[in-house]
Amino acid sequence: MRNHIANKIEAKDKSLSKILNDERFKIDVFQREYRWRRKHIEDLISDLAISFLSNYKIGDGLDKYDSYDSYYMGPIVLCENNGSLSIVDGQQRLTSFTLLLLYLNHLQNSLGIAKESQKDLNKYLYVTKGGKTTLILDIDTRESIIKHLYENPTEIFEGDLEDESVRNIIDRYEDITNLFPEDIKNADVLPVFIEWLIFKVVLVEVRAFSMENAYTIFETMNDRGLNLSPTEMLKGYLLSKV
């Protein structure tokens, strides 16, 4: 029975809301820094804006987003093992969506949108389980920079800038701030965009139940625009055997 479960693989379409809600993800085997560059963020925001604005009509309210076309972001690969859920492939996109949600959270406040029209985005950033509150993407080295961007994004970060991921997170958040389209940056459109982003942006969640199967899937898939070096792939494979 255990072997049957270990060999099981599930694939489901899931909205961003369903993926980032009440889960805690580890990135503890296939170690990979956050490496997206400005071009990746530019492409992501452009694609999202084009898809959303091709559906949105002036005057649309929050009740209209559900009739809009979905936007598919491709697969992510997860491994569920011993009660823990690890991201094997897809953390570049999920980290980028986390940064976008942080930005949108501040933007909806700064635009003076009525509280009843604001979306509670905290539940897509943090999760509380077993009395412990952590980032949904539970990576210790990123906790301080994400907290900083959540609380004081306009101030200079005084934490550790030696970490490649921390530096890239700061730069990519700034890119989001500079690149987010003016057509969506107003109190009428933004709430509809946020609802659409959360519920109509869809990823294919591929879930394996053993690291061996997860690694096999991992070899055939990659984050958008990023390739792993042979050394990184070998490291991931060796760590999966520990």
Q: Which positions does each model-derived feature cover?
A:
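Glycine- and hydrophobic-rich flexible loops that cap the catalytic core of alpha/beta enzyme folds
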Residues: 2-242
